[in-house]
């Protein structure tokens, strides 16, 4: 920037405030936000409910087992019973059920045989995803128990 000399002083003052000082009203807002955990408590309850919708739904599908995570918004179901790589099964779900998952192999050799699903979504979308996966598995793997 090459402003007129009269503007340089004003720009320097603005830059100092932007780069090195948090305004008092912002400090007051941050202090207030830290006083209450109500929004955090609600968020934990929401994610717990969503996790349970997804994981309980997945565990009801023959051939899929899934543990409940305690500290993330991801589910990592075991799909080894289908005899497919995680990449193959993820592609099947995308193509045939319209459900996006991440192959466990993307996280290293120990992730093979698993998929990653995120439950940072609405209850309705999670229920729909479980329904689509269950419908696909029932059609494609009718002998799965």
Q: Predicted regions span which residues?
A:
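PLP-dependent class I/II
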Residues: 1-145
């Amino acid at each position: 920037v090459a402003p007129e000399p009269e503007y340089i002083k004003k720009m320097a003052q603005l830059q100092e405030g932007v780069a090195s000082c948090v305004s008092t009203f912002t400090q007051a807002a941050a202090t207030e936000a830290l006083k209450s955990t109500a929004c955090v408590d609600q968020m934990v309850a929401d994610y717990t409910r969503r996790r349970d919708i997804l994981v309980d739904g997945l565990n009801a599908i023959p051939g899929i087992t899934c543990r409940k995570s305690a500290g993330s918004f991801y589910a990592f179901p075991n799909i080894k019973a289908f005899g497919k790589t995680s990449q193959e099964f993820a592609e099947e779900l995308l193509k045939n059920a319209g459900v996006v998952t991440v192959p466990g192999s993307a996280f290293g050799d120990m992730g093979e045989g698993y998929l990653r699903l995120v439950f940072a979504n609405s209850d309705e979308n999670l229920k729909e995803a479980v329904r689509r996966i269950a419908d696909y598995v029932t059609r494609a793997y009718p002998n799965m128990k």
